Amino acid sequence: MKAILLVLLCAFAATNADTLCIGYHANNSTDTVDTVLEKNVTVTHSVNLLEDRHNGKLCKLGGIAPLHLGKCNIAGWLLGNPECELLLTVSSWSYIVETSNSDNGTCYPGDFINYEELREQLSSVSSFERFEIFPKTSSWPNHETNRGVTAACPYAGANSFYRNLIWLVKKESSYPKLSKSYVNNKGKEVLVLWGIHHPPTSTDQQSLYQNADAYVFVGSSKYNRKFKPEIAARPKVRGQAGRMNYYWTLIEPGDTITFEATGNLVVPRYAFAMNRGSGSGIIISDAPVHDCNTKCQTPKGAINTSLPFQNIHPVTIGECPKYVKSTKLRMATGLRNIPSIQSRGLFGAIAGFIEGGWTGMIDGWYGYHHQNGQGSGYAADQKSTQNAIDGITNKVNSVIEKMNMQFTAVGKEFNNLEKRIENLNKKVDDGFLDVWTYNAELLVLLENERTLDFHDSNVKNLYEKVRSQLRNNAKEIGNGCFEFYHKCDDTCMESVKNGTYDYPKYSEESKLNREEIDGVKLESTRVYQILAIYSTVASSLVLLVSLGAISFWMCSNGSLQCRICI
Protein backbone atom coordinates (compact mmCIF):
# COMPACT_ATOMS: atom_id res chain seq x y z
CA MET A 1 0.00 0.00 0.00
CA LYS A 2 2.83 2.36 0.87
CA ALA A 3 4.42 1.73 -2.53
CA ILE A 4 1.18 2.48 -4.36
CA LEU A 5 0.75 5.74 -2.48
CA LEU A 6 4.30 6.81 -3.29
CA VAL A 7 3.81 6.14 -7.00
CA LEU A 8 0.52 8.08 -7.04
CA LEU A 9 2.10 11.03 -5.23
CA CYS A 10 4.92 11.13 -7.78
CA ALA A 11 2.50 11.05 -10.71
CA PHE A 12 0.26 13.71 -9.13
CA ALA A 13 3.25 15.99 -8.54
CA ALA A 14 4.35 15.67 -12.18
CA THR A 15 0.85 16.37 -13.47
CA ASN A 16 0.47 19.59 -11.49
CA ALA A 17 3.96 20.98 -12.20
CA ASP A 18 4.18 24.34 -13.98
CA THR A 19 5.53 24.03 -17.52
CA LEU A 20 6.98 26.28 -20.20
CA CYS A 21 7.42 25.14 -23.79
CA ILE A 22 9.26 26.64 -26.74
CA GLY A 23 7.61 26.33 -30.13
CA TYR A 24 6.98 27.89 -33.50
CA HIS A 25 4.13 29.18 -35.60
CA ALA A 26 1.98 27.03 -37.89
CA ASN A 27 -1.00 27.93 -40.08
CA ASN A 28 -3.24 26.55 -42.82
CA SER A 29 -0.88 27.53 -45.65
CA THR A 30 -0.45 25.02 -48.46
CA ASP A 31 2.53 26.82 -50.07
CA THR A 32 5.31 24.42 -51.00
CA VAL A 33 8.94 25.13 -51.85
CA ASP A 34 11.86 23.03 -53.02
CA THR A 35 15.24 22.88 -51.33
CA VAL A 36 18.52 21.27 -52.26
CA LEU A 37 17.59 18.16 -50.27
CA GLU A 38 13.78 18.08 -50.42
CA LYS A 39 10.91 18.76 -52.77
CA ASN A 40 7.46 20.16 -51.98
CA VAL A 41 8.20 21.28 -48.43
CA THR A 42 5.10 22.94 -46.98
CA VAL A 43 5.93 26.32 -45.41
CA THR A 44 3.99 28.94 -43.48
CA HIS A 45 5.04 31.81 -45.74
CA SER A 46 6.70 32.15 -49.14
CA VAL A 47 7.09 34.58 -52.02
CA ASN A 48 6.69 33.82 -55.71
CA LEU A 49 9.55 34.93 -57.96
CA LEU A 50 8.10 33.73 -61.28
CA GLU A 51 5.46 35.64 -63.24
CA ASP A 52 3.29 33.44 -65.44
CA ARG A 53 0.33 35.73 -66.17
CA HIS A 54 -0.29 38.30 -68.90
CA ASN A 55 -3.35 40.23 -70.06
CA GLY A 56 -3.39 39.04 -73.68
CA LYS A 57 -3.28 42.63 -74.99
CA LEU A 58 -0.89 44.98 -76.74
CA CYS A 59 -0.68 48.08 -74.55
CA LYS A 60 0.97 51.45 -74.47
CA LEU A 61 4.49 51.33 -73.13
CA GLY A 62 5.21 54.15 -70.72
CA GLY A 63 2.11 55.96 -71.98
CA ILE A 64 3.20 55.83 -75.65
CA ALA A 65 1.17 53.79 -78.13
CA PRO A 66 2.78 51.09 -80.28
CA LEU A 67 2.99 51.33 -84.06
CA HIS A 68 0.80 48.53 -85.37
CA LEU A 69 1.67 47.88 -89.01
CA GLY A 70 -1.48 45.88 -89.69
CA LYS A 71 -1.11 44.01 -92.98
CA CYS A 72 2.13 45.84 -93.78
CA ASN A 73 5.65 44.93 -92.76
CA ILE A 74 8.72 47.06 -92.11
CA ALA A 75 9.72 47.13 -95.79
CA GLY A 76 6.28 48.21 -96.98
CA TRP A 77 6.10 50.92 -94.32
CA LEU A 78 9.54 52.44 -95.01
CA LEU A 79 9.33 52.23 -98.81
CA GLY A 80 5.82 53.62 -98.80
CA ASN A 81 3.84 50.73 -100.29
CA PRO A 82 0.51 52.22 -101.45
CA GLU A 83 -1.29 49.67 -99.23
CA CYS A 84 0.52 51.19 -96.23
CA GLU A 85 -0.39 54.82 -96.91
CA LEU A 86 -2.12 55.25 -93.53
CA LEU A 87 1.24 54.67 -91.82
CA LEU A 88 3.02 57.56 -93.54
CA THR A 89 2.01 60.12 -90.92
CA VAL A 90 3.25 58.10 -87.94
CA SER A 91 6.31 59.69 -86.38
CA SER A 92 6.72 58.12 -82.91
CA TRP A 93 5.98 54.85 -81.16
CA SER A 94 6.92 52.81 -78.13
CA TYR A 95 7.45 49.63 -80.15
CA ILE A 96 6.57 48.27 -83.59
CA VAL A 97 4.13 45.41 -84.16
CA GLU A 98 4.00 43.15 -87.19
CA THR A 99 1.40 40.40 -87.48
CA SER A 100 1.68 36.87 -88.82
CA ASN A 101 -0.01 38.07 -92.05
CA SER A 102 1.93 41.31 -92.57
CA ASP A 103 2.44 40.60 -96.27
CA ASN A 104 2.42 44.08 -97.80
CA GLY A 105 6.12 44.75 -98.20
CA THR A 106 7.93 45.14 -101.51
CA CYS A 107 5.13 45.27 -104.08
CA TYR A 108 7.54 45.30 -107.06
CA PRO A 109 9.41 41.97 -106.82
CA GLY A 110 13.05 41.99 -105.79
CA ASP A 111 15.43 41.69 -102.85
CA PHE A 112 15.67 44.06 -99.91
CA ILE A 113 19.40 44.03 -99.22
CA ASN A 114 20.45 43.77 -95.54
CA TYR A 115 16.79 43.90 -94.52
CA GLU A 116 17.44 42.06 -91.25
CA GLU A 117 20.11 44.59 -90.27
CA LEU A 118 17.69 47.43 -91.00
CA ARG A 119 15.11 45.83 -88.70
CA GLU A 120 17.76 45.56 -86.02
CA GLN A 121 18.59 49.25 -86.42
CA LEU A 122 14.91 50.19 -86.14
CA SER A 123 14.55 48.19 -82.92
CA SER A 124 16.39 50.99 -81.14
CA VAL A 125 14.48 53.85 -82.81
CA SER A 126 11.49 55.36 -81.02
CA SER A 127 10.65 58.17 -83.46
CA PHE A 128 11.75 59.79 -86.67
CA GLU A 129 11.13 62.82 -88.84
CA ARG A 130 10.02 61.96 -92.37
CA PHE A 131 11.24 64.73 -94.65
CA GLU A 132 11.59 65.30 -98.40
CA ILE A 133 15.26 64.75 -99.12
CA PHE A 134 14.91 65.42 -102.86
CA PRO A 135 11.74 67.38 -103.71
CA LYS A 136 9.94 65.74 -106.61
CA THR A 137 9.04 68.92 -108.44
CA SER A 138 12.46 70.54 -108.50
CA SER A 139 15.15 67.89 -108.13
CA TRP A 140 14.89 66.09 -111.47
CA PRO A 141 14.05 68.58 -114.22
CA ASN A 142 15.72 66.50 -116.95
CA HIS A 143 13.98 63.24 -116.07
CA GLU A 144 10.42 61.99 -116.00
CA THR A 145 9.10 61.63 -112.42
CA ASN A 146 5.45 60.66 -113.02
CA ARG A 147 5.68 57.77 -115.49
CA GLY A 148 7.44 55.45 -113.06
CA VAL A 149 4.38 53.47 -111.96
CA THR A 150 3.53 49.78 -112.13
CA ALA A 151 0.60 47.41 -111.96
CA ALA A 152 2.50 45.54 -109.23
CA CYS A 153 1.85 48.44 -106.83
CA PRO A 154 -1.78 49.42 -107.47
CA TYR A 155 -3.71 52.10 -105.62
CA ALA A 156 -7.42 52.84 -106.03
CA GLY A 157 -7.55 50.59 -109.10
CA ALA A 158 -4.73 52.36 -110.95
CA ASN A 159 -1.01 51.75 -111.37
CA SER A 160 1.06 53.38 -108.67
CA PHE A 161 4.43 53.22 -106.88
CA TYR A 162 6.12 53.59 -103.51
CA ARG A 163 5.33 56.88 -101.80
CA ASN A 164 8.89 57.40 -100.50
CA LEU A 165 10.71 56.64 -103.79
CA ILE A 166 10.65 58.05 -107.33
CA TRP A 167 11.19 55.77 -110.30
CA LEU A 168 13.04 58.02 -112.75
CA VAL A 169 12.73 57.21 -116.46
CA LYS A 170 13.85 59.00 -119.61
CA LYS A 171 12.30 62.29 -120.56
CA GLU A 172 11.27 62.25 -124.19
CA SER A 173 14.19 60.32 -125.74
CA SER A 174 16.91 61.30 -123.32
CA TYR A 175 18.20 60.15 -119.93
CA PRO A 176 21.08 62.53 -119.19
CA LYS A 177 23.56 61.71 -116.46
CA LEU A 178 22.28 62.84 -113.10
CA SER A 179 24.24 63.77 -110.00
CA LYS A 180 22.53 64.82 -106.80
CA SER A 181 23.86 65.19 -103.26
CA TYR A 182 22.37 65.66 -99.82
CA VAL A 183 24.21 67.05 -96.79
CA ASN A 184 22.86 65.81 -93.46
CA ASN A 185 22.14 68.94 -91.43
CA LYS A 186 19.57 67.31 -89.14
CA GLY A 187 21.95 66.75 -86.26
CA LYS A 188 21.06 63.05 -86.12
CA GLU A 189 21.34 59.94 -88.26
CA VAL A 190 19.33 59.97 -91.48
CA LEU A 191 18.02 56.77 -93.06
CA VAL A 192 18.09 56.89 -96.87
CA LEU A 193 16.56 54.21 -99.13
CA TRP A 194 16.81 53.74 -102.90
CA GLY A 195 16.34 51.07 -105.56
CA ILE A 196 18.05 49.62 -108.62
CA HIS A 197 15.86 48.35 -111.45
CA HIS A 198 16.88 45.27 -113.47
CA PRO A 199 14.82 45.02 -116.69
CA PRO A 200 14.09 41.63 -118.27
CA THR A 201 15.19 42.65 -121.81
CA SER A 202 17.41 45.18 -123.60
CA THR A 203 14.28 46.52 -125.26
CA ASP A 204 12.83 47.39 -121.86
CA GLN A 205 16.15 48.94 -120.88
CA GLN A 206 16.11 51.28 -123.87
CA SER A 207 12.39 51.95 -123.54
CA LEU A 208 12.80 53.13 -119.95
CA TYR A 209 16.30 54.59 -119.79
CA GLN A 210 17.52 54.97 -123.39
CA ASN A 211 21.08 54.14 -122.32
CA ALA A 212 22.09 50.52 -122.92
CA ASP A 213 25.22 50.67 -120.78
CA ALA A 214 23.80 52.45 -117.74
CA TYR A 215 25.28 52.52 -114.24
CA VAL A 216 24.44 53.85 -110.76
CA PHE A 217 26.88 55.08 -108.14
CA VAL A 218 26.00 55.84 -104.51
CA GLY A 219 28.63 57.20 -102.16
CA SER A 220 29.15 58.71 -98.73
CA SER A 221 32.03 58.75 -96.25
CA LYS A 222 31.13 55.22 -95.16
CA TYR A 223 29.23 53.80 -98.13
CA ASN A 224 30.53 53.51 -101.69
CA ARG A 225 29.08 51.21 -104.32
CA LYS A 226 28.62 51.11 -108.07
CA PHE A 227 25.70 49.19 -109.58
CA LYS A 228 25.19 47.78 -113.07
CA PRO A 229 21.74 46.62 -114.20
CA GLU A 230 21.47 42.86 -114.70
CA ILE A 231 19.32 42.41 -117.80
CA ALA A 232 17.94 38.87 -117.96
CA ALA A 233 14.70 36.99 -118.49
CA ARG A 234 13.08 35.91 -115.21
CA PRO A 235 9.84 34.23 -114.20
CA LYS A 236 7.05 36.72 -113.66
CA VAL A 237 6.18 37.66 -110.09
CA ARG A 238 3.12 39.85 -109.54
CA GLY A 239 3.04 40.20 -113.32
CA GLN A 240 6.62 41.51 -113.54
CA ALA A 241 9.53 39.85 -115.34
CA GLY A 242 11.89 42.56 -114.12
CA ARG A 243 13.32 42.91 -110.62
CA MET A 244 14.04 45.81 -108.31
CA ASN A 245 16.55 45.55 -105.48
CA TYR A 246 16.28 47.88 -102.51
CA TYR A 247 19.18 49.38 -100.56
CA TRP A 248 19.65 51.62 -97.54
CA THR A 249 22.32 53.40 -95.56
CA LEU A 250 22.64 55.66 -92.54
CA ILE A 251 24.10 59.13 -93.05
CA GLU A 252 25.87 60.58 -90.03
CA PRO A 253 25.33 64.26 -89.08
CA GLY A 254 27.40 66.49 -91.37
CA ASP A 255 28.05 63.71 -93.88
CA THR A 256 27.07 63.86 -97.57
CA ILE A 257 25.47 61.22 -99.78
CA THR A 258 25.73 61.49 -103.58
CA PHE A 259 23.68 59.74 -106.27
CA GLU A 260 25.10 59.52 -109.80
CA ALA A 261 23.38 57.55 -112.57
CA THR A 262 22.76 57.16 -116.28
CA GLY A 263 19.71 54.96 -115.78
CA ASN A 264 17.97 52.31 -113.65
CA LEU A 265 17.96 54.41 -110.46
CA VAL A 266 14.96 54.59 -108.15
CA VAL A 267 15.81 57.71 -106.16
CA PRO A 268 14.74 58.57 -102.62
CA ARG A 269 12.05 61.21 -102.24
CA TYR A 270 11.63 61.02 -98.48
CA ALA A 271 14.22 60.10 -95.86
CA PHE A 272 14.02 59.65 -92.09
CA ALA A 273 15.92 61.56 -89.39
CA MET A 274 15.97 59.02 -86.58
CA ASN A 275 15.75 59.42 -82.82
CA ARG A 276 17.12 56.45 -80.97
CA GLY A 277 15.75 55.42 -77.62
CA SER A 278 16.02 52.50 -75.24
CA GLY A 279 13.10 50.17 -74.72
CA SER A 280 11.86 50.13 -78.32
CA GLY A 281 11.72 47.02 -80.45
CA ILE A 282 9.86 44.99 -83.06
CA ILE A 283 7.59 42.10 -82.18
CA ILE A 284 5.40 39.78 -84.22
CA SER A 285 2.03 39.38 -82.53
CA ASP A 286 -1.62 38.77 -83.37
CA ALA A 287 -2.80 40.08 -80.00
CA PRO A 288 -5.23 43.01 -80.17
CA VAL A 289 -4.23 46.59 -79.34
CA HIS A 290 -6.05 48.04 -76.32
CA ASP A 291 -6.11 51.33 -74.46
CA CYS A 292 -4.01 50.08 -71.57
CA ASN A 293 -0.60 50.87 -70.17
CA THR A 294 2.29 48.63 -69.18
CA LYS A 295 6.01 48.61 -68.45
CA CYS A 296 6.62 45.25 -70.11
CA GLN A 297 5.18 43.93 -73.36
CA THR A 298 5.46 40.45 -74.84
CA PRO A 299 3.94 39.09 -78.07
CA LYS A 300 1.40 37.19 -75.96
CA GLY A 301 0.34 40.17 -73.87
CA ALA A 302 1.42 42.78 -71.37
CA ILE A 303 3.03 41.91 -68.04
CA ASN A 304 2.59 44.13 -65.01
CA THR A 305 4.84 42.69 -62.32
CA SER A 306 7.80 43.44 -60.09
CA LEU A 307 8.96 39.81 -60.03
CA PRO A 308 12.47 39.06 -61.33
CA PHE A 309 11.55 36.11 -63.59
CA GLN A 310 8.84 35.23 -66.12
CA ASN A 311 8.10 32.17 -68.24
CA ILE A 312 5.63 33.79 -70.65
CA HIS A 313 7.80 34.61 -73.68
CA PRO A 314 11.52 35.09 -74.39
CA VAL A 315 10.85 38.18 -76.55
CA THR A 316 10.09 41.23 -74.41
CA ILE A 317 10.05 45.00 -74.77
CA GLY A 318 10.37 47.46 -71.90
CA GLU A 319 11.31 46.86 -68.27
CA CYS A 320 10.75 43.13 -68.19
CA PRO A 321 11.69 40.21 -65.94
CA LYS A 322 14.26 37.73 -67.17
CA TYR A 323 12.74 34.84 -69.13
CA VAL A 324 13.43 31.35 -67.76
CA LYS A 325 12.03 27.93 -68.63
CA SER A 326 11.06 27.15 -65.04
CA THR A 327 7.48 26.38 -64.04
CA LYS A 328 7.98 27.20 -60.35
CA LEU A 329 10.31 29.56 -58.48
CA ARG A 330 9.01 30.08 -54.95
CA MET A 331 11.24 31.30 -52.12
CA ALA A 332 10.53 30.35 -48.52
CA THR A 333 10.24 33.19 -46.01
CA GLY A 334 8.48 31.34 -43.21
CA LEU A 335 8.98 28.06 -41.40
CA ARG A 336 8.19 24.47 -42.18
CA ASN A 337 4.43 24.25 -41.76
CA ILE A 338 3.82 21.20 -39.58
CA PRO A 339 0.76 21.74 -37.35
CA SER A 340 0.91 19.68 -34.16
CA ILE A 341 -1.01 16.39 -34.04
CA GLN A 342 -3.52 16.78 -31.23
CA SER A 343 -3.67 13.07 -30.38
CA ARG A 344 0.07 13.14 -29.69
CA GLY A 345 0.00 16.22 -27.54
CA LEU A 346 0.53 19.86 -28.26
CA PHE A 347 4.22 19.75 -28.94
CA GLY A 348 6.44 17.72 -30.79
CA ALA A 349 10.02 18.13 -34.06
CA ILE A 350 11.50 21.15 -35.61
CA ALA A 351 15.28 21.12 -35.30
CA GLY A 352 14.95 17.59 -34.02
CA PHE A 353 13.10 18.22 -30.76
CA ILE A 354 9.71 19.82 -31.48
CA GLU A 355 7.19 17.72 -33.31
CA GLY A 356 4.71 20.28 -34.62
CA GLY A 357 3.91 23.97 -34.80
CA TRP A 358 1.22 25.94 -32.98
CA THR A 359 -1.68 27.36 -34.93
CA GLY A 360 -2.70 29.16 -31.73
CA MET A 361 0.34 31.44 -31.83
CA ILE A 362 -0.54 34.03 -34.47
CA ASP A 363 1.52 37.08 -33.50
CA GLY A 364 5.01 35.74 -34.18
CA TRP A 365 7.15 33.00 -35.68
CA TYR A 366 8.70 31.69 -32.47
CA GLY A 367 7.44 31.79 -28.91
CA TYR A 368 6.21 30.11 -25.75
CA HIS A 369 3.32 28.17 -24.31
CA HIS A 370 3.03 28.16 -20.53
CA GLN A 371 0.80 26.37 -18.05
CA ASN A 372 0.59 27.16 -14.33
CA GLY A 373 -1.91 27.68 -11.55
CA GLN A 374 -3.16 30.89 -13.16
CA GLY A 375 -3.93 29.26 -16.51
CA SER A 376 -2.20 28.74 -19.84
CA GLY A 377 -1.51 30.65 -23.03
CA TYR A 378 0.67 31.43 -26.03
CA ALA A 379 3.09 34.33 -26.40
CA ALA A 380 5.37 35.13 -29.32
CA ASP A 381 8.97 36.13 -28.82
CA GLN A 382 8.80 39.44 -30.63
CA LYS A 383 12.53 40.16 -30.67
CA SER A 384 13.64 36.94 -32.35
CA THR A 385 10.65 37.06 -34.69
CA GLN A 386 11.37 40.64 -35.78
CA ASN A 387 15.07 39.92 -36.26
CA ALA A 388 14.17 36.95 -38.44
CA ILE A 389 11.63 38.96 -40.45
CA ASP A 390 14.14 41.76 -41.04
CA GLY A 391 16.88 39.35 -42.06
CA ILE A 392 14.72 37.35 -44.46
CA THR A 393 13.08 40.46 -45.93
CA ASN A 394 16.48 41.96 -46.64
CA LYS A 395 17.62 38.72 -48.22
CA VAL A 396 14.56 38.42 -50.45
CA ASN A 397 14.86 42.06 -51.52
CA SER A 398 18.54 41.57 -52.24
CA VAL A 399 17.87 38.48 -54.36
CA ILE A 400 15.13 40.25 -56.30
CA GLU A 401 17.27 43.35 -56.78
CA LYS A 402 20.25 41.36 -58.04
CA MET A 403 18.21 39.17 -60.39
CA ASN A 404 15.67 41.80 -61.43
CA MET A 405 17.59 43.13 -64.43
CA GLN A 406 14.84 44.78 -66.45
CA PHE A 407 15.60 44.91 -70.14
CA THR A 408 14.30 44.42 -73.68
CA ALA A 409 14.96 41.11 -75.43
CA VAL A 410 13.92 41.36 -79.08
CA GLY A 411 14.05 38.54 -81.55
CA LYS A 412 16.82 38.32 -84.14
CA GLU A 413 16.09 38.33 -87.86
CA PHE A 414 17.71 36.10 -90.48
CA ASN A 415 16.98 35.81 -94.18
CA ASN A 416 16.33 32.58 -96.04
CA LEU A 417 20.01 32.17 -96.91
CA GLU A 418 21.15 32.32 -93.30
CA LYS A 419 19.51 29.19 -91.90
CA ARG A 420 22.81 27.85 -90.58
CA ILE A 421 23.42 31.06 -88.66
CA GLU A 422 19.81 31.12 -87.48
CA ASN A 423 19.99 27.54 -86.21
CA LEU A 424 23.30 28.24 -84.49
CA ASN A 425 21.83 31.36 -82.92
CA LYS A 426 18.85 29.37 -81.62
CA LYS A 427 21.20 26.84 -80.05
CA VAL A 428 23.21 29.62 -78.40
CA ASP A 429 20.04 31.31 -77.14
CA ASP A 430 18.72 28.00 -75.82
CA GLY A 431 22.03 27.47 -74.08
CA PHE A 432 21.81 30.86 -72.40
CA LEU A 433 18.21 30.16 -71.38
CA ASP A 434 19.26 26.83 -69.87
CA VAL A 435 22.04 28.55 -67.91
CA TRP A 436 19.72 31.30 -66.68
CA THR A 437 17.08 28.76 -65.70
CA TYR A 438 19.63 26.60 -63.88
CA ASN A 439 21.08 29.61 -62.04
CA ALA A 440 17.64 30.84 -60.99
CA GLU A 441 16.50 27.43 -59.77
CA LEU A 442 19.77 26.75 -57.94
CA LEU A 443 19.62 30.16 -56.27
CA VAL A 444 16.11 29.49 -54.98
CA LEU A 445 16.99 25.96 -53.81
CA LEU A 446 20.01 27.18 -51.85
CA GLU A 447 18.20 30.14 -50.32
CA ASN A 448 15.26 27.96 -49.29
CA GLU A 449 17.62 25.52 -47.59
CA ARG A 450 19.32 28.38 -45.75
CA THR A 451 16.02 29.96 -44.71
CA LEU A 452 14.60 26.77 -43.21
CA ASP A 453 17.89 26.06 -41.44
CA PHE A 454 17.85 29.65 -40.19
CA HIS A 455 14.42 29.14 -38.62
CA ASP A 456 15.52 25.87 -37.02
CA SER A 457 18.53 27.64 -35.57
CA ASN A 458 16.38 30.43 -34.14
CA VAL A 459 14.13 27.93 -32.35
CA LYS A 460 17.17 26.16 -30.94
CA ASN A 461 18.63 29.46 -29.76
CA LEU A 462 15.38 30.34 -28.01
CA TYR A 463 15.37 26.94 -26.32
CA GLU A 464 18.98 27.38 -25.19
CA LYS A 465 18.17 30.85 -23.86
CA VAL A 466 15.50 29.39 -21.57
CA ARG A 467 17.59 26.39 -20.55
CA SER A 468 20.56 28.56 -19.59
CA GLN A 469 18.33 30.62 -17.29
CA LEU A 470 16.48 27.78 -15.57
CA ARG A 471 19.45 25.45 -15.12
CA ASN A 472 18.46 22.89 -12.46
CA ASN A 473 15.38 24.82 -11.32
CA ALA A 474 13.51 22.87 -14.00
CA LYS A 475 13.92 19.68 -15.93
CA GLU A 476 13.77 19.11 -19.67
CA ILE A 477 10.88 16.91 -20.69
CA GLY A 478 12.39 16.33 -24.10
CA ASN A 479 9.72 17.78 -26.39
CA GLY A 480 10.74 21.42 -26.22
CA CYS A 481 9.24 21.81 -22.75
CA PHE A 482 10.56 22.52 -19.25
CA GLU A 483 8.91 21.35 -16.03
CA PHE A 484 9.57 23.64 -13.08
CA TYR A 485 10.64 22.34 -9.68
CA HIS A 486 9.00 25.42 -8.17
CA LYS A 487 5.78 27.33 -8.55
CA CYS A 488 6.06 29.78 -11.45
CA ASP A 489 3.24 32.31 -11.70
CA ASP A 490 2.64 34.61 -14.67
CA THR A 491 5.23 37.12 -13.44
CA CYS A 492 7.78 34.34 -13.15
CA MET A 493 6.89 33.06 -16.63
CA GLU A 494 7.28 36.54 -18.08
CA SER A 495 10.72 36.91 -16.50
CA VAL A 496 11.85 33.71 -18.23
CA LYS A 497 10.56 34.98 -21.56
CA ASN A 498 12.21 38.39 -21.32
CA GLY A 499 15.50 37.04 -19.94
CA THR A 500 15.24 38.45 -16.38
CA TYR A 501 14.53 35.18 -14.55
CA ASP A 502 15.90 35.30 -10.96
CA TYR A 503 17.55 31.91 -10.54
CA PRO A 504 18.65 32.34 -6.88
CA LYS A 505 15.13 33.39 -5.85
CA TYR A 506 13.70 30.00 -6.80
CA SER A 507 16.71 27.76 -6.29
CA GLU A 508 15.96 26.80 -2.64
CA GLU A 509 12.36 25.83 -3.37
CA SER A 510 13.49 23.95 -6.46
CA LYS A 511 16.16 22.11 -4.47
CA LEU A 512 13.66 20.95 -1.83
CA ASN A 513 11.10 19.83 -4.39
CA ARG A 514 13.74 18.16 -6.48
CA GLU A 515 15.06 16.21 -3.46
CA GLU A 516 11.54 15.29 -2.39
CA ILE A 517 10.66 14.03 -5.82
CA ASP A 518 13.96 12.20 -6.11
CA GLY A 519 13.35 10.66 -2.65
CA VAL A 520 9.90 9.51 -3.60
CA LYS A 521 11.30 7.96 -6.72
CA LEU A 522 14.09 6.25 -4.74
CA GLU A 523 11.67 4.89 -2.09
CA SER A 524 9.31 3.64 -4.73
CA THR A 525 12.20 1.93 -6.47
CA ARG A 526 13.20 0.10 -3.23
CA VAL A 527 9.59 -1.00 -2.62
CA TYR A 528 9.41 -2.30 -6.15
CA GLN A 529 12.60 -4.28 -5.59
CA ILE A 530 11.19 -5.87 -2.35
CA LEU A 531 7.91 -6.67 -4.07
CA ALA A 532 9.83 -8.30 -6.89
CA ILE A 533 11.75 -10.55 -4.44
CA TYR A 534 8.56 -11.52 -2.57
CA SER A 535 6.84 -12.26 -5.83
CA THR A 536 9.68 -14.49 -7.02
CA VAL A 537 9.78 -16.50 -3.75
CA ALA A 538 6.00 -16.90 -3.65
CA SER A 539 5.90 -18.07 -7.25
CA SER A 540 8.61 -20.66 -6.56
CA LEU A 541 6.72 -22.02 -3.50
CA VAL A 542 3.49 -22.28 -5.46
CA LEU A 543 5.30 -24.18 -8.20
CA LEU A 544 6.88 -26.64 -5.73
CA VAL A 545 3.58 -27.30 -3.93
CA SER A 546 1.85 -27.89 -7.27
CA LEU A 547 4.51 -30.37 -8.36
CA GLY A 548 4.26 -32.23 -5.04
CA ALA A 549 0.47 -32.49 -5.23
CA ILE A 550 0.59 -33.83 -8.77
CA SER A 551 3.22 -36.42 -7.82
CA PHE A 552 1.18 -37.62 -4.79
CA TRP A 553 -1.96 -37.99 -6.91
CA MET A 554 -0.16 -39.98 -9.58
CA CYS A 555 1.40 -42.31 -7.00
CA SER A 556 -1.97 -42.98 -5.34
CA ASN A 557 -3.72 -44.11 -8.55
CA GLY A 558 -0.80 -46.17 -9.82
CA SER A 559 0.18 -43.87 -12.64
CA LEU A 560 3.47 -43.25 -10.95
CA GLN A 561 5.44 -45.87 -8.99
CA CYS A 562 7.69 -44.71 -6.24
CA ARG A 563 10.37 -46.99 -4.78
CA ILE A 564 12.33 -46.01 -1.75
CA CYS A 565 15.48 -48.06 -1.29
CA ILE A 566 17.45 -48.12 1.93
UniProtKB/Swiss-Prot annotation:
Residues 18-529 are extracellular. Disulfide bonds join 21-481, 59-292, 72-84, 107-153, 296-320, 488-492. It is a single-pass type I membrane protein. SUPFAM superfamilies: Influenza hemagglutinin (stalk), Viral protein domain. Gene3D superfamilies: 3.90.20.10, 3.90.209.20, Hemagglutinin Chain A, Domain 2. InterPro entries: Capsid_hemagglutn, Hemagglutn_HA1_a/b_dom_sf, Hemagglutn_influenz_A, Hemagglutn_influenz_A/B. Residues 551-566 are cytoplasmic. It is found in: Virion membrane; Host apical cell membrane. Keywords: Clathrin- and caveolin-independent endocytosis of virus by host, Clathrin-mediated endocytosis of virus by host, Disulfide bond, Fusion of virus membrane with host endosomal membrane, Fusion of virus membrane with host membrane, Glycoprotein, Hemagglutinin, Host cell membrane, Host membrane, Host-virus interaction, Lipoprotein, Membrane, Palmitate, Signal, Transmembrane, Transmembrane helix, Viral attachment to host cell, Viral envelope protein, Viral penetration into host cytoplasm, Virion, Virus endocytosis by host, Virus entry into host cell. Residues 1-17 form the signal peptide. Binds to sialic acid-containing receptors on the cell surface, bringing about the attachment of the virus particle to the cell. This attachment induces virion internalization either through clathrin-dependent endocytosis or through clathrin- and caveolin-independent pathway. Plays a major role in the determination of host range restriction and virulence. Class I viral fusion protein. Responsible for penetration of the virus into the cell cytoplasm by mediating the fusion of the membrane of the endocytosed virus particle with the endosomal membrane. This is Hemagglutinin. It comes from Influenza A virus (strain A/Swine/Wisconsin/1/1961 H1N1). The lineage of its organism: Viruses, Riboviria, Orthornavirae, Negarnaviricota, Polyploviricotina. The gene is HA.
